[in-house]
Amino acid sequence: DDEADRLLKQGYTDLIERLHKQIPKITSDGCRLQMIVCSATLHAFEVKKMAERLMHFPTWGDLKGEDAVPETVHHVVCMVDPHTDSSWQQLRQPIHTDGVHDHDNVHPTNQSPETFSQAVKLLKGEYCIRAIDQHKMDRAIIFCRTKQDCDNLEQHLSQRGGQRFSCVCLHGDRKPQERKQNLEMFKRQEVKFLICTDVAARGLDITGLPFSKDLKYLSENTLNFPNLAVINITLPDDKSNYVHRIGRVGRPESMGLAISLVSTVPEKVWYHGEWCKTRGRSGSCIWYNEPNLLAEVEDHLNITIQQVVKSLDVPVNDFDGKVVYGQKNLNMGTGYEDHVEQLGPTVRKQTDLELQSQSLFLKRLKRLNWFDFGLLHDPKYFHGYEYIKYINKLTLKSCV
C-alpha cells in the first residue's frame, strides 16, 4: 500500500479494512499475511491508528525519521502583499484568474477584502514569471492549488513567452494518455515547466532537473552543483503535501530550491470535495489564510523558512564568515557516494531488524510444530534462516 496516509485521509479506511477482512490471514501452505504500507509522510496519525487495528506488532522502518525532508532542499518564501505592491493595478497581460470574484466589485478604489484577494491572484502570476527569470530557470515543477489554476497558469505562460515558458499540465482533468505524454515530454526536456496539482507530488520520481543551464550564472552565485526548483503558487492546505512537493527537488546528488508564494492577505478560493461536479470552476468558497498554513509547515518541519523580497532574489547570506545558502549540501557532500556513506549505518540497522523479524517468524513456526505438516521440509522453509541472511546481504550490498 503506497501513499498510505493519502488513502486514509481521502476516506478509504473502511474499504481497506473490508479488503483486509476478506484476505486470508494464513494460506494452506503456511504463508502468513504480511501488510506493508509506504509513504514519505508515514507517521501520520491515521496510519498509526490503522497499524494498531490491522497489524500485529508492526515494525516501523524509517531511514530519515519523522517529519523529515531532504537536507538538500532550501525553503524560500516570498510574501505577496497587494498593499505594498500595487503593480497589479497596471498589468498589461494579467493572468486569467479562477473567476471567484467575477460578480464582486473589485477595483483599486474599493479597498475591500475581495479586491485584495483578486490582487493576490494577479500578482502571483507575475511573481511566478519573475522567479523563472530571476533564477534563469530552464526546468522546474510548478504547483497550483486547483486544476483550474493549473490551466490558467499554463495559458498565461504560453501567452507571455511561448517556447521561452514552454509548459504542460498534469492533473486529474487531463486524460490518462495526455498525462503520461505530458510527463514524458517534461522528462525528455521537450518542455521546460511541469504545472501540476498535488496529484503529481506523490509517487513520481523525476530526477535530473537542473533549473539553469547558465553555468556562468551558477558560478557567479557560488552554486557549483546542479540545482533543482519547485515553485509553490499556493501553499497546500495539508502540510504533509508540502513534504511531497519539495521532495521532487531534493536528491542525493543535487541541491534543490523550493520557492513558495505566500499571500499576506486572505484569498477567496473555490472549495470542493471529490464529489464536486463543477470540476473546480464554481460552487462553494473559503477564505484561504496562507500565513497560518506557512506557520503549520514550519512547525511540522521544525524550521524557519527564509523570506526573500519581491524581486525573488535568493541572497548568499554570510554569518561568521560562512556561507549559509548551500551550506547544508556542502556539509553533507554533494556526491551520491557521500550520501550513501551517511545512510550506510541506518540501512544496516534496518537490515538487521528485518533479519530479526523474519527469524522470529521461523522460530514461531517451529514452536507450533508445523514440521508435522511438512511445511518446513521444503528447502525454502528448512533453510529459511540462511536464505534470509543471504537475501539481506544482497540487499545491504546493493544499498551501500
Curated annotation (Swiss-Prot):
Signal peptide positions on this chain: none
PROSITE patterns noted in UniProt: HELICASE_ATP_BIND_1, HELICASE_CTER
CDD domains for the chain: SF2_C_DEAD
SMART domains referenced in this protein's UniProt entry, alphabetically: HELICc
UniProt GO molecular function: ATP binding; ATP hydrolysis activity; chromatin binding; DNA/RNA helicase activity; exonuclease activity; nuclease activity; poly(A) binding; RNA helicase activity
Entry annotated with the keyword Hydrolase: yes
Catalytic activity from the UniProt record: ATP + H2O = ADP + phosphate + H(+)
EC class: hydrolase
Enzyme Commission code(s) on record: 3.6.4.13
Keyword ATP-binding in record: yes
Key words, A-Z: ATP-binding, Exonuclease, Helicase, Hydrolase, Nuclease, Nucleotide-binding, RNA-binding
Family assignment from sequence similarity: Belongs to the DEAD box helicase family. DDX1 subfamily.
Task performed by this protein: Acts as an ATP-dependent RNA helicase, able to unwind both RNA-RNA and RNA-DNA duplexes. Possesses 5' single-stranded RNA overhang nuclease activity.
Full protein name: ATP-dependent RNA helicase Ddx1
Gene: Ddx1
